Amino acid sequence: MSQTALILLQRVEHLGQMGDLVHVKPGYARNFLLPQAKAMRATAANKKRFETERAQLEAQNLKKREEAERLAERMHELSVVIIRQAGDSGSLYGSVSTRDIAAAATEAGLTISRQQVVLAHPIKQLGLTEARIVLHPEVSIPLTVNVARSAEEAERQARGEAIGVQDEDENILGELQAENAAEEAAAEAAEASEEA
């Protein structure tokens, strides 16, 4: 399989640091790294150009990183609430996407794009979930996503209280146990009346 040689212009997660010579699949280079100016082809002319511009690129990167760190300090322990419909078991009708999280974060005062939101797994249940907001390739902040059916439920979840799904299950279990006890009492009464 052919590989394309590139020089990274910034840190790329799981690939390398600025200035690294990397070999990637042509599609990854053509569709992601080159259009987003994260890398340039590793030709002799580009290598010379990169070495002459390296100090300028590093200074730009340092400035952007410092801005991202200042923003990260201001947005420490950020949390967003997303209201969704869900079934009795707590399963969402659909899922919460990175686009939904980016929109909620923008409403909370942090303007980000959906590409900056990183989820470990899709959100398909009610509850609190951790996401990560990548402000810079070297700076990210945690984000708590509170998915609930209503604002009141979101407040209860934020305080650490159990939501209604478990309460309903306990009520149903209690009702079933009461019905079973009543049936057993009726059966015992019927047996006692037959014996007499």
Swiss-Prot record:
Keywords: Ribonucleoprotein, Ribosomal protein, RNA-binding, rRNA-binding. Belongs to the bacterial ribosomal protein bL9 family. It holds the Pfam family Ribosomal_L9_C. GO terms for cellular component: ribonucleoprotein complex; ribosome. The lineage of its organism: Bacteria, Pseudomonadati, Pseudomonadota, Alphaproteobacteria, Acetobacterales. SUPFAM superfamilies: L9 N-domain-like, Ribosomal protein L9 C-domain. Binds to the 23S rRNA. PROSITE patterns: RIBOSOMAL_L9 (PS00651). GO terms for biological process: translation. InterPro entries: Ribosomal_bL9, Ribosomal_bL9/RNase_H1_N, Ribosomal_bL9_bac/chp, Ribosomal_bL9_C, Ribosomal_bL9_C_sf, Ribosomal_bL9_N, Ribosomal_bL9_N_sf. It comes from the Bacteria. This is Large ribosomal subunit protein bL9. GO terms for molecular function: rRNA binding; structural constituent of ribosome.
